[in-house]
């Protein structure tokens, strides 16, 4: 069993070899928008899982996921041969291709966040012209300011409290 660091290095090398082969050597038109996003190799170095995503030909066109999966399955033997020649390991790992759903999930999250921002903006527009129901301060007791005379006499009573230190001048 190989150490995990070697498995990570091999996974990165396999990812580079397969991506290069898909881009430059394999002439299947269904692989035109395929990008290898990640790869993982088991610790015994016998199995490699390659994650891929497919881009459409334009922004409006939906990617051909089924066509890309079929093309990768068809090219699996050629790709494994290239991996064996490029890595130099004793046993060439078997390749498995899995569609990467992270970009789709990220796009979905961006849509949800945009929808939440729009709802917040709508709520802010509604709040602009809104007024509070009832009085401005329902707990305000009217007339307290008038009893104190508004000159701070109430505050002066509370300043001269006895602290129990025999009436020092510092109080």
Curated annotation (Swiss-Prot):
| Record GO terms (molecular function) | ribosomal small subunit binding
Q: Where is the composition biased (Basic and acidic residues)?
A: 126-138
Q: Where is this region: Disordered?
A: 126-171
Superkingdom, taxonomy of origin: Bacteria
One GO cellular-component annotation of the UniProt record comes to:
cytosol
Entry annotated with the keyword DNA repair: no
Which InterPro entries is this protein grouped with? KH_dom-like_a/b, RbfA, RbfA_dom_sf, Ribosome-bd_factorA_CS
Q: Does the keyword Ribonucleoprotein apply?
A: no
Alphabetically list the UniProt keywords.
Cytoplasm, Ribosome biogenesis
Localization per record: Cytoplasm
> A single GO BP annotation from the record?
maturation of SSU-rRNA
The primary location reported for this protein is cytoplasm
- Partners and quaternary state? Monomer. Binds 30S ribosomal subunits, but not 50S ribosomal subunits or 70S ribosomes.
| Stated role | One of several proteins that assist in the late maturation steps of the functional core of the 30S ribosomal subunit. Associates with free 30S ribosomal subunits (but not with 30S subunits that are part of 70S ribosomes or polysomes). Required for efficient processing of 16S rRNA. May interact with the 5'-terminal helix region of 16S rRNA.
Q: Which family does it belong to?
A: Belongs to the RbfA family.
Q: Could you identify this protein by its name?
A: Ribosome-binding factor A
Tell me what organism the protein belongs to: Mycobacterium sp. (strain KMS)
Q: What is the lineage of its organism?
A: Bacteria, Bacillati, Actinomycetota, Actinomycetes, Mycobacteriales
């Amino acid at each position: 069993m190989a150490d995990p660091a070697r498995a990570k290095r091999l996974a990165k090398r396999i990812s580079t070899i397969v991506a290069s082969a898909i881009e430059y050597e394999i002439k299947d038109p269904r692989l035109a928008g395929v990008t290898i996003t990640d790869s993982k190799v088991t610790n015994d170095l016998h199995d490699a899982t390659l994650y891929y995503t497919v881009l459409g030909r334009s922004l409006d066109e939906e990617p051909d996921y089924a066509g890309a999966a079929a093309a990768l399955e068809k090219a699996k033997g050629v790709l494994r041969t290239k991996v064996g020649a490029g890595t130099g390991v004793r046993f060439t790992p078997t390749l498995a291709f899995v569609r990467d759903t992270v970009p789709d999930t990220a796009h979905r999250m961006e849509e949800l966040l945009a929808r939440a921002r729009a709802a917040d903006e709508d709520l802010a527009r509604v709040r602009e012209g809104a007024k509070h129901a009832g009085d401005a301060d329902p707990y305000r007791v009217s007339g307290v300011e008038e009893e104190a005379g508004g000159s701070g006499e109430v505050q002066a009573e509370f300043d001269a409290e006895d602290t129990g230190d025999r009436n020092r001048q510092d109080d």
